[in-house]
Amino acid sequence: MWRVKTLNLGLSPSPQKGKPAMSTPLRELKLQPEALADSGKGPSMISALTPYLCRLELKERCNNSSPVDFINTENNFLSEQFSHPSTHIEACQRESDPTPESNSLFHTLEEAIETVDDFVVDPRDDSIVESMVLLPFSLGQQQDLMLQAHLDTTAERTKSSLNESLGLEDLVGKEVAPCVEDSLTEIVAIRPEQPTFQDPPLGPSDTEDAPVDLVPSENVLNFSLARLSPSAVLAQDFSVDHVDPGEETVENRVLQEMETSFPTFPEEAELGDQAPAANAEAVSPLYLTSSLVEMGPREAPGPTVEDASRIPGLESETWMSPLAWLEKGVNTSVMLQNLRQSLSFSSVLQDAAVGNTPLATCSVGTSFTPPAPLEVGTKDSTSETERLLLGCRPPDLATLSRHDLEENLLNSLVLLEVLSHQLQAWKSQLTVPHREARDSSTQTDSSPCGVTKTPKHLQDSKEIRQALLQARNVMQSWGLVSGDLLSLLHLSLTHVQEGRVTVSQESQRSKTLVSSCSRVLKKLKAKLQSLKTECEEARHSKEMALKGKAAAEAVLEAFRAHASQRISQLEQGLTSMQEFRGLLQEAQTQLIGLHTEQKELAQQTVSLSSALQQDWTSVQLNYGIWAALLSWSRELTKKLTAKSRQALQERDAAIEEKKQVVKEVEQVSAHLEDCKGQIEQLKLENSRLTADLSAQLQILTSTESQLKEVRSQHSRCVQDLAVKDELLCQLTQSNKEQATQWQKEEMELKHIQAELLQQQAVLAKEVQDLRETVEFIDEESQVAHRELGQIESQLKVTLELLRERSLQCETLRDTVDSLRAELASTEAKHEKQALEKTHQHSQELRLLAEQLQSLTLFLQAKLKENKAESEIILPSTGSAPAQEHPLSNDSSISEQTPTAAVDEVPEPAPVPLLGSVKSAFTRVASMASFQPTETPDLEKSLAEMSTVLQELKSLCSLLQESKEEATGVLQREICELHSRLQAQEEEHQEALKAKEADMEKLNQALCLLRKNEKELLEVIQKQNEKILGQIDKSGQLINLREEVTQLTQSLRRAETETKVLQEALEGQLDPSCQLMATNWIQEKVFLSQEVSKLRVMFLEMKTEKEQLMDKYLSHRHILEENLRRSDTELKKLDDTIQHVYETLLSIPETMKSCKELQGLLEFLS
């Protein structure tokens, strides 16, 4: 009678306030970032646990489980048996977990025996199976049930990539029968009042309760092996304690215990070809409560085609690499700690698992169908596993490519990391468990049932070999992960370079805008200076006009000229002011655009800095991981060196044994040396031939090494022939029985020698493989460390460049602000200057109006005095008084102007605009209209003024005509000069064109000469190369001819030697033994030829190994140099970061308020 008792974590524990949700580490490895917990959605697709981790869990569970785990909870099961009845039955879900893969048949047998030993034996009843009730799965368990469909679809995709690296597990997997798909548990879920998860059923439902039936012992054994799943191990190893807010504190115990009894002992069970399949299949863990549902058998169909994909030997499961998982943005620090805890599996936690057992939130009834009985074979599994282990040998690293070596290196690194974590866990297990943990695990009384356990351990060498083969399959994706990491880093570098280009473009644009603004300012300054010069010229012309002899004509002409000039100047000033306003508006719009672009640049710099900070954190984490890997790899390399020393000692022992065997062979051959007197003639002939060979070897020094080898072979052949001759003589004299015995002994010795040579070669290969693997591990770890250092240096350089650019942007900001201030100041100065000019022009217009009034008054006085001559006004009569009066007027005007200026300066008049009513034009007009009111006879004065103006107009027309004539003469002279200049320029251009044509001709001639020289040089080089090639070929031909002659001579000598030897043997031997002697000679010749071929192959291999060693040394020197450079660069980067940090600390307090600077300081600190 056997019973199954399970205490369940009914619902997933809710997290406490301020603490993250606890979850098992390997379950977190299974989940992808997309598969987030959501009660309102269906289960998302997740990645499966790696087969290697599954095997580690099973192995450590089998090794670390104690009998107390199964005894402590027996009474608790009985106390809770009828606590929570089930109310509602839901659809049944049938789904199978991915099959855990075993290392070998021996490993599967070991697991089976260990799990069977944990059961309680009760020989009275062997068929009664108690029913059990299941609680609903947590979200991680439900997602584990979703894996099988995804694994079946991805098995064929991954099979092609995994077939290349299949090792010992493939051979084991081929012996394993396909798993039975339908021999699974049926889970009948009872719906609670408030369900936590609403997932659709994954398989057909069956709510019928089967009756109790007899279960054979073989099925019980297979079922017990099938119950061991990775999630069950996690449930045993990790327990969670927390209190939900607003609810009671409930004890939750995650501990799975099984108690079974069957009549047969584990030693009597013999597993056949289908046993590994039954052992390898793992079903999702059951979370049981006390409510019981009866269980009955169900017929299990045979294996189908779909089961072929579940063979344990094939690595068809998908998994997520740690680096890709880290790149998805998971909290790496917590996950790494959980991963270390998951790989430790301490037995203390298994013995004292403390948790919270929830009350009856929901319950699930199940009808369990045990698997169909499997055929039991009589094959010896241990002999089969030993045969498989001896048949699978490690590959020769000399024949592998660089890619394969890198994959092997990555596999070994991960294996070393996992083994190091396991060693740490096993060391921690030796310590005494905590008293609270021991006390908290005792919820039930211990049962008196005795449990026996017979663990078996493989040898260390076999375990290491199996672990290496497993690591080869586990770590195939690390090469791809490193390539993805490098591609990501290259993409980040390209993004940074693009950012650099954009920043440089923006800076160039800002510089062009600043240069355009400076040009506009320079143009405005030039215009202002031209206006000043024009004002001075106008003043000078006015003074010259006032000093003229003809007062009236000169004044009118000067007035007209001055008025026209001033009007044109004012119009030009208006146009220039309008242009200036347009330019100012354009500059303002450009400044607004610059401001917006500057804001965008600031946002981009912030985003880039945040991205770089994230990249820096990820790189630091990766750096820590790699450092840990390197430390563990060094420790394991020390262990490997110790093992290699042991292997060398074993090899020395084998060599000593070989020497003993050689001594025995010498002893056997010593008693055959009595008959050497009969072959003294052959020795004399041999000495003569050796003398001839030595003479020819002195002549042919170039082939001395080859002739030495031929001599040694010849001497060996002579010795062998002598031995054989002696044997033949003895055979003729002695009986045939002695000959047969001698041949048997010789064959045995050859066999022993061959075996010793094979063992020696295998040992040498293994030692070389171990050395090469250790060296490759060291080199690749150094290369990875250097690459990480280079990446860090590049990222730091990009950070420095971004900081420099941010500083440049700040300086550009300051320059823009200064330019704005300069623009404002220039605008204010320009406005002030314009106001001053308008004020001066208004004063000048007032003075001109006063002068006109004085002229009119003077003319009226003259007209009153000369009433008789009022009809005709000659220009000569008015010229004399006009010359005297302007001088007085000039003096009076010059005296009045400062007083007027003094009177008008202190008045705070408002600033007049150009187009307003208070401008200079309106003031002049108002004065001219207001002045006649003071005169009594306005009409008379107007008439007189009109007549005077007409006369002045006539005089002005005459003057204009004379001026036009003078200007025409000047223009004609200018035209003639222009024509002369054009003719001279044309002549000069023609001369220049002729010179340019000559220069082009000369350049073309020079180009032709250069081309000819290059062609001649190329022809000479080709001829030299041809001559050198011909010389080399001729030298090679001479060497080949010499070699051919030497070879022909050696062949002839060998033929003569063989003929002489055959004749000597024929003369010495009887006619009955001649056929045997000839056959024996032919065999010896054939063997000598094969020996020569093998020696040549050995020399070639030796040269290849030397070349490989040279390459290895060169690569090692290069890598050491790169490491040194990376260390120096890292030091420089650290110094620069420290300097930047110090400079940022020395920034004044006004700049410290900037958020970006604060963020940089926090990041650097």
UniProtKB/Swiss-Prot annotation:
Its main location: cytoplasm. It comes from the Eukaryota. This is Sperm-associated antigen 5. Induction: Expression is cell cycle-regulated, with an increase from prophase to cytokinesis and return to basal levels at the next G1 phase. One of its GO terms (biological process) is positive regulation of intracellular transport. Homodimer, with a globular head domain and a long stalk. Homooligomer; the globular head domains associate, resulting in aster-like structures. Binds to microtubules in the mitotic spindle. Interacts with DCLRE1B/Apollo. Part of an astrin (SPAG5)-kinastrin (SKAP) complex containing KNSTRN, SPAG5, PLK1, DYNLL1 and SGO2A. Interacts with KNSTRN. Interacts with RPTOR; this interaction competes with RPTOR binding to MTOR, resulting in decreased mTORC1 formation. Interacts with G3BP1. The complex formed with G3BP1 and RPTOR is increased by oxidative stress. Interacts with OSBPL8, PCM1 and CDK5RAP2. GO terms for cellular component: centriolar satellite; ciliary basal body; ciliary rootlet; cytoplasm; cytosol; kinetochore; microtubule plus-end; midbody. Residues 453-821 are annotated as: Interaction with KNSTRN. InterPro entries: Astrin (IPR028728). It comes from Mus musculus. Detected in testis, but not in the other tissues tested. Residues 440-449, 876-897 have a biased composition (Polar residues). Essential component of the mitotic spindle required for normal chromosome segregation and progression into anaphase. Required for chromosome alignment, normal timing of sister chromatid segregation, and maintenance of spindle pole architecture. In complex with SKAP, promotes stable microtubule-kinetochore attachments. May contribute to the regulation of separase activity. May regulate AURKA localization to mitotic spindle, but not to centrosomes and CCNB1 localization to both mitotic spindle and centrosomes. Involved in centriole duplication. Residues 509-856, 937-1146 form a coiled coil. It is found in: Cytoplasm; Cytoplasm, Cytoskeleton, Spindle; Cytoplasm, Cytoskeleton, Spindle pole; Chromosome, Centromere, Kinetochore. Residues 1-23, 431-457, 875-907 are annotated as: Disordered. The modification Phosphoserine is found at S12, S14, S66, S161, S321, S333, S342, S946. Keywords: Cell cycle, Cell division, Centromere, Chromosome, Coiled coil, Cytoplasm, Cytoskeleton, Kinetochore, Microtubule, Mitosis, Phosphoprotein. One of its GO terms (molecular function) is microtubule binding. Phosphorylated by AURKA.
